[in-house]
């Protein structure tokens, strides 16, 4: 693995050597015995003079006003309530930070250092220099921001954007606003102040040459990364870690006494002890050595460490979990509705262990009665307890092939909370009346006790109702009519879904089978059938009723919102569709049904998978919010997550909110106020994204591990991405994606058309575009780098007899050249 050189900040401090060539005054040194200026300690704040102003020597002329601006009258020097503290601290004190902030808040706009100096009576060269350094320190500490004209303003008085930093391996990044809206572009020099995942305040500085809003970092609110995975390296006596995550652009320097016994080249877990800034790299210490090589057995462990997933439960949490009863005793039931004789069943995957939901359906004069019974986690996990605090911290269970990082200890998630068959369990019920058009006409929520009559799988249900398999039907016995009625209800709900225009994306999830060493032995696509969709529609119905009930009772709760596509993304989508002679309505008029119509139109095309993927990527991200904004994808006016409290904290919050409304207690007696619920909704959204990233990383590594076994093999696929450096190809059967580098195309000079997404040879005229079918040869796969390289073997329309370039030396693909941003 190629390693980066230590970043500049990783070198020994220049302060260790004498500064022989420094000019008088520039280094701010003093002669022996001469007392330091009273403001000299401000230099320890580590800030250079503010941008746009050079340090002046002691004999420099007094600063003047900024060009084109009238200098405000000094008047009376403002009262400084902290003057005594400053006088005690410095021999020649200047205005305190508090006084500077108070003055700026009274000004009509940003003030330059010269204007502030005039107002504060600090116009002498040394006093002006001291003020300049203090202002620089306040900018560094996030108390002030400085605009391009050199004016300073308090952060809270400016229109700043709060968001999360999303880094790009090329060095630049984006700020994803927490309030939604378009991202801010962050150039490389701004990205040196932050790391991927940091929550920051930023200000919009202008529009870049591509028409994107550009921003600068004003203050880091919360560090998003406290540890990372990487290769430990030693170069010229300096220890550092090269991050495995290429979005972390700077190597982490490791002090000699913090190496944890790691050797050069080993894979390690590094805990960050000091954040980076524009001049210094991050500092860290080694907390675990994973080994010399990333093996399949380490893939999940690496993801857990790299994404900082809470893995082990604190002892106090385990102690509380151990005190929870293992069975439901008669005395615990109280006045709960008794559903134990109702033939509720669970329907899940073969490998499921935690059973959140059970369903029952019966026909009646008005249509159908649907009972959705959900594990009553809120009965066991109470607000403010160690169990609740840990569940809140995790916010979601994380699912890897063959392994789960649960939100709750297994004694609850796989035990007393899980709706296992033939045992009594506490549940929280949404009982619905559904008419023959698939609309819920009435619903009610109540606490109950149930006894699942069977643990069914999607495969069993599909065989019984979809394939009419006699053996499966006989095995189900008395439950078969109930399952058939559920399938009848599904057809009704499915028609209602189609009528309202909900988007129907066909999922293509890859499932891996591992042996006891963690090696991938099998990979295949998860096939969704009506059994999956049956449960999905039942859960959606209950989720909608939960959202409606909460809205009617005005109880703070996290809604699951999915807004229409961002306008800029949608504009790009329209341009893309033009190349395929397809279209959608303008952004202001687009509805979910428009997507559905287009998906039906392209379903039989050979490039349908690619087009569907592009349509999916154009969508907004679904998040949790204390305010209901509806769900665009499902074409619903209100939506909340109610059905999975064992594995999702928002569902637990929704249960608590509904129960509070049912109790009839005043709103001000609810555990959470609106502000607290907003903070929890944001945290749950962030934790969900973290889990998704961890699951995606493991998926990518296992895909690469699977393709390592097929190096030299040939496969058919479709071009899923076109760039200036090559083609991305998605294989038909496994959905694995790899790169055909331009060096693995027929020899030519290739021109990339960013608008049409094509790569065209100037001499031969060969053209490659999105959706083209190709045959590739697997050239190389690296589980550690999460990269798969292909070589083009056949392209539809390509002239026969075209010579392909020879393989690069030792079978390695040519080095990818970084594109300028």
Task: Locate each region found by the language model.
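Acidic/polar residues at beta-strand termini and the immediately following turn/coil
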Residues: 147, 177, 243, 435, ...
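A generic structural signal for residues embedded in beta-strands
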Residues: 202, 270, 722, 776-778
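Intrinsically disordered, low-complexity linker and terminal regions at domain boundaries
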Residues: 198, 206, 215, 741-784, ...
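A short macromolecule-binding patch
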Residues: 182-187, 248-254, 735-753, 802
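A structural feature that tracks compact, well-ordered secondary-structure segments
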Residues: 185, 728-730, 779-781
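Electropositive polyanion-binding surfaces
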Residues: 269, 275, 300-302, 306-309, ...
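Charge-lined substrate channels and their catalytic hotspots, especially those that engage the 3′ end
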Residues: 2-371, 378-423, 455, 460-463, ...
């Amino acid at each position: 693995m190629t390693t980066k050189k230590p970043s500049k900040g990783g070198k020994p401090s220049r302060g260790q050597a004498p500064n022989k060539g420094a000019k008088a005054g520039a280094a701010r040194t003093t002669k022996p015995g001469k007392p330091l200026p009273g403001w000299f300690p401000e230099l320890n704040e580590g800030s250079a003079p503010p941008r746009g102003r050079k340090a002046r020597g002691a004999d420099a002329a007094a600063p003047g006003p900024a060009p084109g601006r009238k200098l405000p009258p000094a008047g009376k020097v403002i009262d400084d309530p902290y003057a005594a503290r400053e006088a005690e601290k410095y021999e020649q004190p200047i205005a305190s930070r508090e006084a500077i902030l108070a003055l700026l808040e009274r000004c009509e706009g940003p003030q330059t250092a010269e204007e502030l100096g005039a107002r504060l009576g600090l116009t002498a060269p040394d006093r002006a220099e001291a003020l300049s350094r203090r202002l620089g320190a306040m900018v560094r500490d996030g108390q002030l921001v400085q605009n391009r004209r050199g004016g300073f303003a308090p952060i809270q008085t400016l229109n700043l954007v709060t968001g999360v930093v999303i880094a790009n391996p090329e060095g630049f990044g984006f700020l994803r606003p927490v309030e939604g809206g378009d991202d801010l572009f962050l150039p490389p020099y701004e990205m040196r102040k932050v790391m991927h995942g940091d929550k920051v305040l930023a200000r919009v500085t202008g529009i870049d040459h591509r028409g994107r809003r550009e921003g600068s970092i004003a203050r880091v609110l919360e560090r998003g990364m406290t540890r990372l995975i990487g290769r430990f390296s030693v170069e010229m006596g300096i220890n550092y870690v090269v991050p495995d995550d290429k979005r972390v652009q700077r190597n982490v320097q490791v002090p000699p006494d913090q190496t944890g016994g790691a050797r050069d080249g080993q894979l390690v877990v590094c805990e960050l002890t000091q954040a980076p800034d524009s001049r210094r790299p991050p500092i860290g210490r080694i907390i675990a050595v994973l080994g010399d090589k990333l093996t399949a057995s380490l893939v999940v462990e690496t993801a857990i460490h790299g994404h900082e997933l809470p893995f082990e439960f604190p002892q106090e949490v385990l102690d509380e979990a151990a005190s929870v009863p293992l069975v439901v005793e008669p005395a615990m039931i109280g006045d709960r509705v008794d559903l134990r004789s109702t033939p509720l069943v669970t329907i899940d995957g073969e490998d499921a262990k935690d059973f959140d939901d059970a369903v029952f359906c019966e026909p009646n004069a008005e249509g159908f009665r649907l009972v959705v019974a959900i594990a009553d986690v809120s009965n066991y996990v109470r607000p403010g307890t160690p169990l609740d605090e840990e569940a809140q911290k995790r916010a979601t269970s994380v699912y890897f092939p063959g392994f789960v990082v649960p939100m709750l200890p297994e004694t609850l998630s796989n035990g007393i909370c899980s709706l296992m068959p033939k045992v009594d369990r506490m549940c929280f019920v949404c009982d619905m009346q559904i008419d023959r058009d698939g609309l819920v006409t009435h619903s009610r929520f109540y606490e109950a006790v149930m006894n699942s009559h069977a643990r069914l799988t999607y495969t069993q249900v599909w065989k019984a109702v979809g394939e009419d398999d006699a053996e499966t039907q006989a095995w189900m016995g008395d439950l078969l009519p109930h399952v058939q009625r559920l399938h009848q209800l599904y057809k009704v709900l499915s028609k209602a879904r189609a009528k309202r225009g909900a988007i129907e994306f066909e999922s293509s999830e890859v499932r891996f089978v591992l042996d006891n060493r963690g090696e991938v032995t099998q990979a295949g696509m998860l096939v969704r059938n009506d059994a999956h969709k049956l449960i999905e529609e039942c859960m959606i119905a209950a989720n909608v009723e939960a959202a409606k009930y909460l809205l009617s009772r005005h109880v703070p709760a996290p809604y699951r919102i999915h807004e229409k596509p961002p306008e800029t993304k949608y504009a790009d989508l329209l341009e893309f569709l033009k190349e395929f002679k397809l279209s959608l309505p303008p952004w202001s008029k687009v509805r979910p049904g428009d997507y559905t119509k287009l998906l039906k139109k392209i379903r039989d095309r050979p490039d349908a998978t690619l087009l569907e993927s592009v349509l999916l990527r154009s969508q907004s991200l679904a998040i949790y919010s204390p305010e209901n904004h509806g769900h665009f994808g499902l074409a619903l006016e209100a939506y909340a997550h109610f059905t999975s409290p064992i594995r999702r904290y928002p569902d637990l919050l929704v249960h608590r909110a509904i129960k509070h409304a049912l109790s009839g207690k005043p709103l001000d007696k609810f555990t959470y106020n609106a502000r607290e619920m907003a903070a929890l909704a944001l945290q749950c959204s962030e934790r969900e994204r973290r889990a998704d990233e961890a699951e995606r990383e493991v998926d990518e590594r296992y895909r690469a591990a699977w393709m390592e076994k097929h190096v030299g093999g040939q496969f058919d696929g479709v071009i899923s991405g076109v760039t200036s450096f090559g083609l991305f190809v998605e294989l038909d059967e496994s959905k694995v994606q790899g790169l055909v580098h331009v060096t693995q195309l027929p020899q030519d000079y290739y021109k990339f058309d960013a608008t049409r997404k094509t790569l065209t040879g100037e001499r031969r005229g060969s053209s490659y575009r999105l959706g083209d079918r190709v045959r590739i040869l697997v050239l190389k796969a690296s589980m550690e780098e999460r990269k798969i390289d292909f070589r083009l073997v056949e392209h539809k329309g390509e002239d026969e007899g075209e010579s392909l370039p020879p393989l690069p030396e030792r079978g390695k693909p040519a080095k990818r050249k970084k594109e300028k941003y």
